[in-house]
């Protein structure tokens, strides 16, 4: 099914008649008017983290770039981002792509995302265009209670109904190799192609997944190459993919790009070459400068909502590099005009998904309701109410992470607590209930154990240095992690631009310096090391118990490091 503009406006009017909130500005009626252009269209979303329902998600106020990445996309936040892209303050775009005045703007513009609303937009755009592909950049099966409890099945069924045609992955691998193979052999067979050129077996180096596909769109051969997250066995427990090897595989990618361009003698080579990537945007920018023959990189992993493609020059041409945000908040639309065997022009829009501007697709809404029904009572349990603004996003800390850290320290009697620098997890506004579903939206992983250890001060510092280098190494190919680990109970300083091993300093508990040889009781969760595989209770149990005892969550002071050498950096607001 697809929606014409007339049908779309009729659905919008029906929603208003039913009492659903609609913003009153006249331009809202035309917010999703996107005139068709060219003869090939690519629709792309990524990193939805299993968010089937509309939600709130605050963008970061700290997304520092270092080296060549400083003060350029994607490392722009707040007012610097608005100025760079020409967004008006207090506009829908300002709310979608920045953290500015988030609470007030969220109440004004309502929730974002939701697969039923995304489905409506996808149908509208595909009806208006001729040949198109819908691509999913991965991190789709993880991030919610229902996705964890169904081992991703709720999202897999939603992907199929949405019409996804091609996918790559990252967090999706944390259900284990056997589950991934099962989905590809059964659920995806004949409908969705899972592509990854950079995954091979550890024994003989055989490809695990199909590396690329070539589709004919309106007579134009379009090649799509898959690029899974290259550091999956480092960022997550190795046991999930024990027989698979991951990497950037730049050389192999170049060979594939040359191959699909050249054809095989029986048919013409691809006129458009696309990399569906889960590298992260900084990695993609470097890759685009070194690998030739790729027209477009549709990127993910770093959750960067980049409204305008970055054009990267290389030895034989140029590559458009994009990154399409996260949590189902946006849908990227790339229209290409292909003539004479090459792209001669393009149009790109990163469309925010405002739930109050897009009527819910009935078929998708029914599917979501059916998937949630067996768990509805458990999901709806109100464990507490927040008076604080609870969010997770940013290089160093966030209020939701601070809440988890406080819970770890209090419930485990620890001096120090660590919480992973995950980028996923929905946002709660002051006055909203914290349901069990919200607890799970911050913690739903397949290795949730809480760990309590004795750790020497020098070990703590060494660990922080390693994590910091994963984030701030000036060579993007060495940026292997998420954001900086969140820390409770201990203050420290951080110099992102310093050399490896010299970024962390002035570690203190209260006024007392952390001593190198002294041991400290440290609580954490999400252990990657095999030693802690069955170490303790799931973190969601601990957090829910803590919240039930507190009943009300009040604003708390963020434990943000003292930053050195970042004055004037437009990735910090």
Predicted feature locations:
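Hydrophobic faces of stable alpha-helices that mediate helix-helix packing
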Residues: 250-253, 372, 376
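Glycine-rich phosphate/diphosphate-binding loops and the adjacent beta-loop-alpha structural elements
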Residues: 380-397
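Acidic, Ser/Thr/Pro-rich beta/coil linker or hinge segments at domain junctions
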Residues: 355-363, 370, 377
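Short, Φ-rich (hydrophobic/aromatic) sequence segments
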Residues: 368-372, 543-545
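Acidic, metal/ion-coordinating pockets
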Residues: 2-13, 19-354, 395-407, 471, ...
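Short, solvent-exposed loop/turn motifs
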Residues: 221, 389-390, 491, 513
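Feature captures C-terminal
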Residues: 29-41, 45, 51-67, 191-198, ...
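Short, compositionally biased low-complexity segments
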Residues: 80-96, 229-230, 373-384, 435-439, ...
């Amino acid at each position: 099914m697809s929606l014409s503009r007339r049908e779309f406006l009729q659905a919008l009017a029906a929603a208003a008649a039913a009492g659903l909130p609609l913003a009153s500005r006249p331009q809202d009626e035309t917010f999703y008017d996107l005139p068709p252009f060219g003869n090939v269209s690519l629709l792309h979303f990524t990193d939805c983290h299993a968010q089937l329902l509309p939600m709130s998600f605050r963008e970061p106020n700290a997304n520092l770039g270092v080296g060549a990445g400083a003060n350029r996309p994607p490392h722009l936040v707040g007012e610097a981002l608005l100025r760079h892209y020409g967004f008006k303050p207090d506009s829908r775009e300002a709310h979608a792509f920045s953290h500015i005045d988030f609470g007030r703007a969220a109440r004004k513009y309502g929730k974002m995302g939701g697969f039923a609303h995304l489905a409506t937009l996808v149908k509208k755009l595909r009806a208006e265009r001729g040949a198109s592909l819908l691509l999913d950049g991965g991190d789709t099966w993880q991030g919610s209670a229902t996705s964890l409890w169904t081992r991703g099945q709720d999202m897999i069924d939603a992907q199929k109904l949405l019409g996804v045609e091609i996918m790559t992955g990252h967090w999706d691998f944390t259900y284990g190799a056997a589950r991934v193979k099962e989905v590809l052999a059964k659920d995806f067979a004949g409908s969705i192609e899972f592509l990854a050129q950079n995954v091979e077996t550890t024994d003989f180096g055989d490809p695990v997944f199909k590396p690329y596909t070539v589709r004919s769109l309106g007579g134009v051969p379009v090649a799509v190459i898959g690029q899974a997250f290259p550091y999956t066995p480092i960022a997550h427990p190795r046991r999930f993919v024990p027989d698979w090897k991951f990497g950037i595989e730049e050389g192999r990618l170049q060979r594939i790009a040359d191959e699909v361009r050249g054809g095989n003698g029986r048919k013409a080579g691809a006129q458009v070459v696309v990399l569906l990537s889960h590298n992260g945007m900084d990695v993609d920018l470097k890759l685009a400068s070194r690998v030739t023959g790729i027209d477009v990189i549709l990127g993910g992993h770093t959750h960067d909502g980049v409204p305008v493609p970055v054009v990267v020059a290389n030895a034989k041409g140029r590559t458009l590099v994009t990154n399409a945000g996260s949590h189902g908040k946006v849908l990227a639309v790339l229209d290409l005009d292909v003539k004479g065997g090459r792209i001669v022009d393009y149009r790109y829009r990163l469309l925010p998904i405002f739930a109050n501007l897009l009527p819910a697709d009935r078929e998708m809404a029914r599917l979501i309701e059916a998937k949630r029904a067996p768990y509805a009572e458990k999901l709806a349990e109100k464990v507490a109410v927040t008076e604080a603004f609870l969010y997770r996003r940013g290089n160093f800390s966030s209020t939701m992470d601070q809440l988890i850290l406080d819970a770890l320290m209090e419930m485990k009697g620890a001096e120090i607590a660590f919480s992973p620098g995950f980028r996923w997890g929905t946002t709660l506004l002051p006055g909203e209930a914290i349901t069990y579903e919200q607890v799970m939206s911050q913690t739903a992983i397949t290795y949730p154990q809480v760990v309590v250890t004795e750790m020497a001060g020098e070990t703590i510092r060494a660990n922080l240095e390693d994590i910091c280098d994963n984030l701030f190494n000036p060579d993007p190919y060495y940026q292997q992690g998420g954001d900086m680990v969140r820390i409770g109970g201990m203050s420290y300083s951080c110099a992102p631009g310093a050399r490896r091993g010299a970024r962390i300093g002035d570690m203190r508990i209260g006024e007392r310096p952390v001593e190198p040889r002294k041991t400290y009781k440290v609580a954490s969760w999400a252990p990657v090391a095999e030693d802690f595989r069955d170490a303790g209770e799931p973190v969601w149990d601990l957090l829910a118990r803590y919240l039930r005892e507190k009943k009300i969550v009040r604003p708390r002071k963020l434990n943000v490091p003292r930053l050195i050498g970042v004055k004037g950096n437009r990735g910090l607001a």
